């Protein structure tokens, strides 16, 4: 459903954000 899609997108965005932070440090 829509909610699982939102959760998947949030998970992916979270991983991308963590990777971005790792690049910055």
UniProtKB/Swiss-Prot annotation:
Keywords: Amidation, Amphibian defense peptide, Antimicrobial, Secreted. GO terms for cellular component: extracellular region. GO terms for biological process: defense response. The modification Valine amide is found at residue 25. InterPro entries: Dermaseptin_dom. Belongs to the frog skin active peptide (FSAP) family. Dermaseptin subfamily. This is Dermaseptin-5.2TR.
């Amino acid at each position: 459903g829509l909610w699982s899609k939102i959760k998947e997108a949030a998970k992916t965005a979270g991983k991308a954000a963590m990777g971005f932070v790792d690049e910055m440090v």
